């Protein structure tokens, strides 16, 4: 069975079993809602156990979650550094033009026939996502996921076609 990262437990929060999670999912409200089931993996990416979310709230850049039946810091402290994953079968169907992060990261980016680089990360600074493109011999390129820039996404071909608008590439 395939699993996909949705977050990493970075610390505990208070004494009542809450944990700070650095989310790497574009569906945090869905993934961390009360009753949702996730799978814990340790630092060596080994399965630990399935857990059920008892509560979730946002605080600054973190998602604060609590697992069902784990209501004390001593119970959950050992999970610091562990990953939270969702089973592939639990992924939601997406609308046309929507993609999961794991589908986008690693795609090659082209402007015309020229390889620009590879998408290494997705940022969520505000109104739209920003794709971080790793380039050879140059600084990373930040591409907003908006229609004038991203022309086509072809998941099966692992290719993204873009038009780098004036001002986006400060090295040209």
UniProtKB/Swiss-Prot annotation:
Q: Which Pfam families match?
A: PRC, RimM
How does the record comment on the protein's domains? The PRC barrel domain binds ribosomal protein uS19.
Q: What does the record give under GO molecular function?
A: ribosome binding
The organism's lineage is: Bacteria, Bacillati, Bacillota, Bacilli, Lactobacillales
A Gene Ontology CC term for this entry?
ribosome
Ordered alphabetically, the record's keywords are: Chaperone, Cytoplasm, Ribosome biogenesis, rRNA processing
- Indicate where this protein resides in the cell: Cytoplasm
Q: Which cysteines are joined by disulfide bonds?
A: none
Q: Which organism is it from?
A: Streptococcus pneumoniae serotype 4 (strain ATCC BAA-334 / TIGR4)
Q: Which family does it belong to?
A: Belongs to the RimM family.
Which named protein is this? Ribosome maturation factor RimM
Record keyword Chaperone present: yes
Assembly mode = Binds ribosomal protein uS19.
Q: Gene3D superfamilies from the xrefs?
A: PRC-barrel domain, RimM
Ranges of residues in domain PRC barrel:
96-168
Output the SUPFAM superfamilies linked to this UniProt entry. Answer: PRC-barrel domain, Translation proteins
Protein purpose: An accessory protein needed during the final step in the assembly of 30S ribosomal subunit, possibly for assembly of the head region. Essential for efficient processing of 16S rRNA. May be needed both before and after RbfA during the maturation of 16S rRNA. It has affinity for free ribosomal 30S subunits but not for 70S ribosomes.
Q: Which InterPro entries match?
A: PRC-brl_dom, PRC_barrel-like_sf, RimM, RimM_N, RimM_N_sf, Transl_B-barrel_sf
Query: Which superkingdom is the protein from?
Result: Bacteria
One Gene Ontology biological process: ribosomal small subunit biogenesis
